């Protein structure tokens, strides 16, 4: 039995999310069915994160245990062939230690949220970004975002369906940058609560529109009350960018 680490890219638009669902297609199901077709084995894959419906992945990390003798290259090529025409691609495949785990060995996760700030309808970016027609002050958004960095109770920014034991998380970075009409919001932490990134982005958009101040955002955080959330951004603009592991950071897994 060999444990393979998979790096997965996917367009979230056709899927109900990463995790298997009873009521619709998922990225996990697509990959597991491809593994079964290639190896003849019933596969269960584990991932660094579980994205919602219509959320995308640039480099989601997952792992699968496979008994059939197969090289990483042949496995990657065979899976990509089986996955077509689904918008899912295996970017990399490598053997790892049997105790390595895509979720539990992970020490950092990074997301990027894309906003297209223009009035004209989206053509190429439809379903791949959040269109905001009102002018956004990206500098005000970035300045306000810094009050969220650090260790806090993020109850205000947590979905009512979140299964995490504690709402306390440490946000390592929250940066807002603009290039023309594109605004990208980058968030990095060891882990996130359900809907945390989208909730933070929605409130930052209120700051960018001048409807909230930085103080309003800080007050919403301090309230630790989901009812104080100003706006939850849609899933379309959210991308899981990478998962970080101890060998890549020098940190010890815990």
Swiss-Prot record:
One term of GO molecular function: RNA binding
Chain coiled-coil ranges: none
Alphabetically ordered keywords of this record: Isomerase, tRNA processing
InterPro entries with a match to the protein in the record: PsdUridine_synth_cat_dom_sf, PsdUridine_synth_TruA, PsdUridine_synth_TruA_a/b_dom, PsdUridine_synth_TruA_C, TruA/RsuA/RluB/E/F_N
Reactions that this protein is recorded to catalyse: uridine(38/39/40) in tRNA = pseudouridine(38/39/40) in tRNA
Residue sites binding substrate per the record: 111
GO terms for biological process, alphabetical: tRNA pseudouridine synthesis
EC primary class: isomerase
Gene3D superfamilies, per the entry: Pseudouridine synthase I, catalytic domain, C-terminal subdomain, Pseudouridine synthase I, catalytic domain, N-terminal subdomain
EC annotation from Swiss-Prot or TrEMBL: 5.4.99.12
Active site residues according to the UniProt entry: 52
Domain of life: Bacteria
Subunit structure: Homodimer.
Purpose: Formation of pseudouridine at positions 38, 39 and 40 in the anticodon stem and loop of transfer RNAs.
PANTHER family named among the record's database cross-references: PSEUDOURIDYLATE SYNTHASE, TRNA PSEUDOURIDINE SYNTHASE-LIKE 1
Similarity comment text for this entry: Belongs to the tRNA pseudouridine synthase TruA family.
The protein's name: tRNA pseudouridine synthase A
Gene (UniProt): truA
């Amino acid at each position: 039995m060999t444990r393979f680490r998979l790096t997965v890219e996917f367009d979230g638009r056709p899927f109900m999310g990463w995790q298997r669902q009873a009521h619709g297609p998922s990225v996990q199901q697509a990959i597991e069915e491809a593994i079964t077709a290639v190896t003849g084995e019933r596969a269960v894959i584990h991932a660094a994160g579980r994205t919602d419906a219509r959320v995308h992945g640039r480099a989601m990390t997952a792992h699968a245990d496979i008994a059939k003798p197969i090289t990483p290259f042949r496995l990657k090529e065979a899976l990509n062939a089986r996955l077509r025409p689904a918008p899912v691609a295996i970017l990399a495949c490598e053997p790892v230690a049997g105790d390595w785990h895509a979720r539990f060995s992970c020490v950092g996760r990074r997301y990027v949220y894309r906003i297209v700030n223009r009035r004209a309808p989206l053509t190429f970016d439809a379903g791949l970004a959040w269109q905001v027609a009102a002018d956004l002050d990206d500098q005000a958004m970035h300045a306000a975002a810094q009050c969220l960095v650090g260790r806090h109770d993020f109850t205000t920014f947590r979905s009512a369906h979140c299964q995490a034991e504690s709402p306390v998380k440490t946000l390592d970075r929250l940066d807002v940058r603009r290039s023309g009409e594109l605004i990208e919001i980058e968030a990095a932490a060891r882990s996130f609560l359900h809907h945390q990134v989208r909730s933070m982005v929605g409130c930052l958009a209120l700051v960018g529109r001048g409807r909230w101040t930085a103080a309003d955002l800080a007050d919403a955080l301090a309230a630790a009350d989901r009812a104080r959330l100003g706006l939850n951004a849609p899933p379309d603009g959210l991308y899981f960018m990478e998962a970080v592991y101890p060998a890549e950071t020098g940190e010890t897994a815990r």
